[in-house]
Amino acid sequence: MGTDPRNRGMFFLVLTIFAHGCFPLPYAKAMQSIQPTVAVVGIFCCALLFSIPGAWHLRRKFNFRLKNIAIIVAVALLGMLANYSICQAIVGSSATMFNVISRAEIIIAMILGWVYLHEHVGLRIWIAVAVVLSGILLMRGDTLTFNLADWETVLWALCTAGCFAAVQVLSKSIIHEVDPQVLNVLRLSLAVALLLAVPGLAMEMSTLTLGDWGWLGLAAFFGPFLGRVSYTYALRYHTIARAMTAVTFSPVLTLLFEFLIFGRMLSALELIGGTLVMIGILVAFRETGSSH
């Protein structure tokens, strides 16, 4: 007897929340000793190794159409930029703060889903955008200046959000023609090939220690592998809006783990602003939920 689709959908959502809550922490540890570009290559190499077995088993679930190939190329490029942005955002910053701000991916994806996939978006989405922006401003309330350096973390986190939102919309457009694991291996393979073609980067990879590879492996497992694959599977059972809103709660896990591992806690302004960001996302979710 087959598993109830609702149970499968819930399983993938819970798995996605856990992965998204964990992944910023090994990124943060890796950034203590590794350059961002080198880290991205290492993470993608590890994620590729994790993904190959499942993709090989499902290798026939790929429709070789020009549109699908073009989307895979776009997803690979966006994934490279997104992971580089993660590394830049986390350097010298809080993993929890990054995770909260990057949840803006949810609203960006809703808007992109409205534009390209014709998923419903109403007035509450735009109210949610205003609430989220207010929360971000409050989180940076101690540095409300026009100094770009003070906002570097926020800008990199928003870049991450935009890239991943586009990845999810593009992935959902071919979800029934390309299995998520096959898609993941193809985009990772392309990204690794492009990055290793950069002069000198392969040589820098050879200097990584076993400890460095351990943190990169954990970052790859929770990020490009488990986080992305489980999320893409979740899109088979849920709209982008519903699935991404569930991931809103992942920063709570990040906050807990960051305190346990790094002994770091957000300031009062950051906690209040982060809560406001999450409220804004839940406002957006209420809009999508009322439309079904």
Question: Model segments located where?
Answer:
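Loop-to-transmembrane-helix transition segments
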Residues: 7-18, 56, 60-86, 129, ...
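Helix-helix packing/entry segments at the starts of transmembrane helices
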Residues: 11, 39-42, 97-104, 171-192, ...
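Hydrophobic transmembrane alpha-helices of multi-pass small-molecule transport proteins
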Residues: 112, 124-142, 195, 248, ...
